[in-house]
């Protein structure tokens, strides 16, 4: 037990993230500012201090579902390490990431069936959404039928890559004009949340529709000349030169 403070301090200060930040006048970098720390071994607090924040038994509930606990300096006390998960669950924070992921998956699947289709669940997207929410609630939104005239990829890409939505498909694999998103919160006022998400997606799809229609005004052959104006790499010519080399290589591989 005497070794734990030093070990925990070393672990926390050695963590790496793709993007980090500094705050106040500290040189320490972390993924987000540290506001409080819970470090327990059984009933005892493991003493650790980072950027002036000392470890203790106090945590906070969900930012929106239990705002008083977030604003109140007293917070909620976790009496021992074994109680950590349940105390936070009682305050609308689902700590178990595996349970949270499977809850999201099941909510998305069930809601898609209710809407007359089935959800296309990308595992990478599911993993990302899992770490964006503490108390997941799935909800369904819609978009105008006219956008279904776009290629499937033009609809799914802004849904998945930009908005973190799950597409809803028919039995034949074609898209329904619906999507499922996951809210970090409860079931109150879901229609308001859905409306906001629909508005954002509508703008994305309108952009996709515009660029798709603009691209169709010219055949692909008409765009070849533009490849000459884009550099590929110093000493290796432009994108047209690269394309021609690929044509020759493909011909040689195919026909010898």
Residue ranges and their predicted role:
Residues 115-120, 212, 253-256:
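Inter-helical turn/loop segments and adjacent helix faces that build the functional surface
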Residues 107-111, 226, 249-252:
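A general alpha-helix detector
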Residues 120-244:
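Catalytic nucleotidyl-transfer cores of nucleotide-processing enzymes
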Residues 1-148, 155:
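Long, basic N-terminal domains or extensions that often function
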Residues 243-256:
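Histidine- and acidic-residue-rich, metal-dependent catalytic cores
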Residues 28, 42-46, 52-55, 171-173, ...:
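Short, glycine-/Ser/Thr-/acidic-enriched flexible segments
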């Amino acid at each position: 037990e005497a070794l734990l403070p030093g070990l925990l301090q070393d672990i926390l200060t050695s963590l790496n993230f793709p993007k980090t930040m500094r705050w106040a006048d500290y040189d320490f970098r972390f993924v987000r500012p540290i506001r409080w720390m819970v470090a327990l071994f059984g009933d005892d607090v493991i003493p650790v201090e980072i950027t002036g924040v000392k470890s203790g038994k106090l945590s906070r509930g969900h930012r929106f579902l239990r705002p008083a606990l977030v604003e109140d300096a007293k917070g909620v006390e976790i009496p021992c390490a074994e109680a950590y998960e349940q105390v936070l669950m009682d305050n609308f924070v689902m700590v178990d990431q595996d349970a949270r992921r499977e809850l999201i998956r099941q909510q998305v699947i069930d809601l898609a069936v209710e809407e007359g289709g089935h959800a296309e669940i990308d595992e990478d997207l599911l993993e990302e959404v899992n770490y964006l929410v503490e108390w997941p609630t799935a909800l369904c939104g819609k978009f105008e039928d006219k956008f279904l005239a776009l290629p499937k990829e033009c609809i799914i890409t802004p849904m998945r890559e930009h908005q973190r939505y799950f597409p809803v498909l028919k039995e034949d694999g074609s898209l329904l004009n619906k999507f499922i998103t996951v809210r970090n919160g409860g079931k109150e006022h879901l229609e308001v949340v859905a409306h906001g998400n629909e508005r954002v997606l509508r703008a994305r799809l309108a952009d996709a529709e515009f660029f798709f229609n603009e691209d169709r005004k010219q055949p692909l052959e008409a765009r070849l000349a533009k490849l000459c104006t884009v550099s590929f790499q110093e000493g290796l010519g432009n994108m047209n030169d690269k394309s021609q080399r690929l044509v020759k290589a493909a011909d040689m591989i195919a026909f010898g």
